[in-house]
């Protein structure tokens, strides 16, 4: 099936007719489809028939999106019905006994859409809308249903939350692609987390109401999530405060709720107390509201790497938590793909099917990358093992739609899911007038680069023959590399002035500028490789200096961008494209040195600081520079710092330290750590650490640090036991 659907996608992208073109426009791919192949034009008018109860349904309203006039006397009839209505029973083949199932029958005389429920009927209309693109229909009989009951998105990333307009656009996208869940849980919303007891101010409350209503119109459950774990007290007062807050949200129009206890420690992490609270909420709020869907819960041990089987946190939840409550799970680690074995492991412990929170394409831990690749890696056989599957996206809402397009298809029809084909189709939908430019650019923005979770993605597979030519030293290698660079620069130029999706281009702009730098660097290196003359401008020396200059400009752009103060940086093509150009640079310089007796440095890399150590959650974090400030990227999770373990930052040159501070998220924790500096291979010298007051989580250094010369800094847990901390920031300033 993979090749079949990929070819269809490419035909559509190229505008080439196909006998399957109309049905193949439907996304997600239907479960069952009987195609006769006859294509015909949309009628100029049609008559719509439905029960009075369905006149105000979202399915009936969505039908208006098709540009056909309604005429009570038109010979072409569109019938909308529920399966339990008379018209639905007369439609013929019974539907699968699954929520949101629908059938769509299209003939030259009329259309009949039957849904098991109103949302299923709405999905049938959405499929008709997809099929009717370009003003054509196709005789067909579709029976369709979702593999996963709850499908969609959780806005659960750290960093800049989505704007209100971005959320509205997302909800439109979810409805269009048959996703029925949007969980509102932005970490920076104070009324979701830090001030969870407090009501929203009137203006913010109106925005929540608008989102909830807009979601309803798109067939999406708008979940409002509350995160009380940071400071909850297991008291009647706090229990009632939580229920009261949910009541206030209900009054704003919210009909779906989630409770998060992730990324915390201390009193709030107790499984029995969490279960007791959730059961109380379920009994005294959820079950008393007939129009509210089941409660969703994100536990503290939300992945296998953090689960402590000996303490039995997950088993306690499984045995005591009401079975109607959904339990979220990220997999074998915080960022991990899901397979059947991992689902068997968690489902046995929580005594229900896990509700997957998939941390892709979220980039809050690799903010220097933008992730435009396909959604792949999850098992195609796990549909019976999951109750829900939601994606945590990037803060770049429009760019996230590329991956979300595939996730919608995957959760609807797993067995026929083809990540590559879906990716091709997504590019066409997101930017149809510049699809090839977007595709070319996206090829170099798939992988996450080095990161604390060790989660990587395929990138640069299309460069395999080019890389092989470079490694062999083929004479054709420079031309092959240059062609790729020219295509990348052309794509970036086209996209930078595209006006059809301005929000997407705003999100991509920093990476588009860096892509141009990368392409310029590659072309300069290719000119070097072809240079035979050391006298005529540009000489080899000129091209060498130009190449090194562009690499430094790339580094400057990476570290001057201030979109994210905690982790600046703009990286493109770091997995294959940039290393390939660097290799060509090195081979070219080495060959020139050998032939001309010169001594040019053959490395163009510019990495002045490196991080190492034996704290697994930290050692893969990138190091960045802004002016004189050097920073380690923050981590969003609880750091389990082993006894005696340390991290070390090493500089390529001796630096003079001016100041330093870091935030491990806990007041008074400085006494558990030792900071040392060393110059070259010299002795380690300890630097005193202190907090400015008892409530200050920021750790400051003593005055002796100022003026110290160093090439290495080391921070060690000096206690004899594991320390659980955050890693909010780590900065030092050099002269």
What is the meaning of each model-derived region?
Residues 580-587, 592-657, 663-673, 677, ...:
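Disordered, acidic Ser/Thr/Pro-rich linker "stalks" and the adjacent N-terminal cap
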């Amino acid at each position: 099936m993979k090749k079949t659907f990929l070819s269809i996608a490419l035909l559509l992208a190229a505008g080439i007719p196909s006998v399957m073109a109309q049905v193949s426009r439907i996304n997600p791919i239907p479960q069952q489809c009987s195609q006769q192949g006859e294509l015909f034009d949309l009628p100029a008018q049609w008559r719509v028939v439905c029960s009075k109860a369905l006149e105000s349904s979202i399915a009936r309203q969505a039908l208006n999106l098709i540009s056909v006039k309604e005429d009570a006397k038109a010979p072409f009839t569109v019938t909308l019905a529920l399966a339990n209505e008379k018209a639905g029973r007369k439609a013929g083949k019974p539907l699968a006994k699954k929520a949101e199932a629908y059938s769509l029958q299209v003939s030259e005389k009329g259309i009949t859409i039957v849904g098991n429920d109103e949302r299923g009927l709405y999905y049938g209309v959405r499929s008709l809308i997809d099929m009717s693109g370009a003003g054509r229909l196709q005789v067909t009989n579709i029976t369709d249903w979702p593999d996963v009951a709850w499908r969609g998105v959780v806005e659960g990333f750290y960093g800049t939350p989505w704007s209100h307009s971005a959320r509205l656009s997302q909800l439109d996208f979810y409805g269009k692609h048959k996703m029925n869940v949007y969980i509102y849980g932005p970490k920076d919303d104070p009324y979701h987390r830090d001030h969870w007891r407090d009501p929203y101010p009137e203006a913010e409350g109106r925005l929540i109401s608008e989102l909830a209503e807009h979601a309803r119109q798109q067939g999406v459950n708008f979940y409002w999530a509350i995160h009380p774990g940071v400071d909850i007290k297991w008291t009647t007062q706090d229990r009632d405060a939580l229920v009261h807050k949910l009541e206030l949200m209900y009054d704003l129009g919210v009909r779906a709720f989630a409770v998060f206890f992730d990324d915390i420690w201390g009193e709030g992490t107790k499984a029995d107390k969490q279960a007791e609270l959730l059961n109380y909420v379920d009994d005294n709020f959820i079950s008393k509201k007939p129009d509210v869907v089941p409660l969703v819960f994100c536990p503290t041990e939300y992945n296998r790497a953090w689960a402590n089987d000996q303490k039995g946190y997950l088993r306690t939840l499984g045995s005591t938590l009401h079975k109607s409550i959904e339990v979220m799970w990220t997999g074998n680690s915080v960022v991990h793909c899901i397979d059947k074995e991992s689902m068997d492991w968690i489902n046995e412990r929580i005594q229900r099917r896990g509700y997957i929170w998939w941390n892709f394409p979220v980039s809050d831990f690799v903010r220097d990358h933008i992730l435009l690749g396909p959604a792949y890696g999850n098992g195609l056989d796990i549909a019976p093992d999951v109750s829900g599957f939601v994606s945590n996206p990037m803060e770049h809402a429009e760019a996230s739609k590329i991956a979300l397009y595939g996730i919608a298809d995957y959760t609807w029809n797993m067995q026929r899911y083809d990540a590559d084909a879906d990716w091709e189709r997504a590019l066409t939908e997101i930017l149809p007038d510049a699809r090839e430019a977007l595709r070319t650019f996206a090829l170099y923005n798939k992988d996450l680069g080095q990161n604390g979770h060790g989660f990587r993605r395929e990138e640069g597979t299309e460069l395999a023959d080019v890389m092989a030519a470079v490694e062999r030293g083929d004479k054709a290698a420079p031309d092959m590399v240059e062609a790729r660079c020219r295509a990348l620069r052309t794509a970036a130029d086209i996209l930078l002035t595209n006006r059809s999706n301005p929000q997407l281009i705003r999100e991509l702009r920093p990476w588009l500028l860096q892509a141009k730098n990368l392409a310029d660097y590659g072309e300069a290196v290719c000119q070097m490789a072809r240079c035979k003359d050391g006298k005529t401008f540009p000489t080899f020396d000129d091209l060498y200096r130009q190449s090194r200059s562009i690499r430094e400009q790339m580094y400057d752009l990476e570290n001057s961008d201030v979109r994210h103060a905690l982790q600046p940086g703009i990286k493109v093509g770091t997995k294959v494209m940039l290393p390939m150009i660097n290799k060509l640079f090195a081979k070219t310089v080495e060959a020139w040195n050998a032939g001309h007796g010169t001594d040019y440095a053959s490395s163009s890399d510019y990495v002045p600081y490196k991080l190492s150590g034996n704290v697994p959650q930290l050692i893969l974090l990138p190091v960045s520079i802004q002016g004189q400030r050097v920073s380690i990227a923050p981590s969003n999770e609880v750091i389990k710092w082993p006894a005696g373990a340390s991290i070390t930052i090493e500089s390529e040159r001796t630096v003079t330290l001016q100041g330093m501070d870091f935030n491990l998220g806990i007041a008074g924790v400085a006494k558990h750590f030792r900071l040392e500096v060393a110059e070259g291979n010299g002795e380690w010298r300890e630097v005193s650490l202190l907090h400015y007051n008892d409530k200050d989580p920021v750790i400051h250094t003593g005055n002796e640090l100022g003026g110290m010369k160093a090439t290495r800094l080391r921070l060690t847990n000096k206690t004899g036991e594991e320390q659980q901390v955050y890693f909010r920031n780590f900065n030092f300033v050099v002269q």
